[in-house]
């Protein structure tokens, strides 16, 4: 696998050899000094060019970055509408294990790009000194955010409201219905509550990473193993056990956050647990 230095040099040389490539920015985790580097991090680049169609019309230039195994063009897909409403992107996997994303952006959209940026940007090439402001990579947009009392209430309300759907799905033997609500709504609210608990104890000036991937660093082994146990969903019995554990964990962490944040505690669980017990457990 090529090194980071080799990839950055390759991309920079590409820009300097082409008059219509004016600026290249590196984005994402490779700009974030708060994340430990490893060789599997993606390379996310923004190429600011004078003519996007020049590059999209004939795409042999992509092979200059290595031997391609797979490519996706989000702006050229029908089933999955692209997130970006300006520019054109390539998601590429290379034979040596490198994953590289290149987004072509018209030079006229430079200010819009910085306005929309998440802060994790580093300028690699600026041939004409067009970037006038100082650009320093910053991950503060992803830091934990202290909840308002209303946000705390809303999280509790959503969790207990959706818990009834999981219980009903298991009772009806509609496992995919139950799992969808469990995985996509219920557990994310548990993770949100745990993240607030961590924030109140450790501060709100850092990130837990995408999909809470660093959350284990801020929990005890016992706490993290209990969280992992909510993912054991092999069949109805196991799913319901995990669901009940999820509810117990949510009660534990929401009570902690209520105390730490000096919030009134909305005692939703008593009525909802009675509702579930009376309707889906008899």
Swiss-Prot record:
What this protein catalyses is: streptomycin + ATP = 6-O-adenylylstreptomycin + diphosphate
- Reported EC number(s) for this entry are 2.7.7.-
Could you give a single Gene Ontology term from the biological process aspect? response to antibiotic
> Is the keyword Transferase in the record?
yes
Q: Any idea which GO molecular function terms this record carries?
A: transferase activity
Disulfide bridge partners, by residue number: none
User: Does this entry carry the keyword Transferase?
Assistant: yes
Pfam families noted in UniProt: Adenyl_transf
What UniProt keywords are attached to this protein's entry? Answer: Antibiotic resistance, Plasmid, Transferase
Per the entry, what this protein does is: Required for streptomycin resistance. Adenylates streptomycin on the O-6 residue.
Q: What is this protein called?
A: Aminoglycoside 6-adenylyltransferase
Q: What is the organism of origin for this protein? A: Staphylococcus aureus
Give the gene symbol.
str
């Amino acid at each position: 696998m090529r090194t980071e230095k080799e990839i950055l040099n390759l991309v920079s040389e590409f820009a300097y050899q082409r008059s219509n490539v004016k600026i290249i920015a590196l984005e994402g985790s490779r700009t974030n000094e708060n994340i430990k580097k490893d060789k599997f991090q993606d390379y996310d680049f923004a190429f600011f060019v004078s003519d996007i169609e020049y590059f999209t019309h004939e795409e042999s230039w992509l092979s200059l970055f290595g031997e391609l195994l797979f490519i996706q063009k989000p702006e050229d897909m029908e089933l999955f509408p692209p997130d970006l409403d300006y520019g054109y992107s390539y998601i590429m996997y290379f034979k040596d294990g490198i994953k590289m994303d290149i987004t072509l952006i018209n030079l006229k959209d430079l200010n819009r790009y910085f306005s929309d940026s998440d802060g994790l940007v580093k300028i690699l090439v600026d041939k004409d000194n067009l970037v006038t402001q100082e650009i320093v990579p910053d991950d503060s947009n992803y830091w934990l955010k202290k909840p308002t009392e209303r946000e705390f209430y809303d999280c509790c309300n959503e969790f207990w409201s959706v818990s009834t759907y999981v219980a009903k799905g298991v009772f009806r033997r509609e496992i995919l219905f139950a799992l969808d609500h469990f995985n996509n709504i219920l557990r994310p609210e548990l993770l949100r509550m745990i993240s607030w608990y961590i924030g109140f104890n450790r501060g709100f000036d850092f990130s837990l990473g995408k999909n809470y991937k660093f959350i284990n660093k801020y929990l005890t082994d016992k706490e993290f193993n209990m969280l992992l146990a909510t993912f054991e969903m092999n069949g109805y019995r196991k799913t319901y056990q995990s669901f009940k554990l999820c509810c117990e964990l949510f009660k534990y962490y929401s009570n902690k956050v209520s105390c730490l944040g000096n919030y009134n505690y909305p005692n939703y669980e008593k009525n909802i647990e009675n509702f579930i017990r009376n309707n889906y457990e008899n």
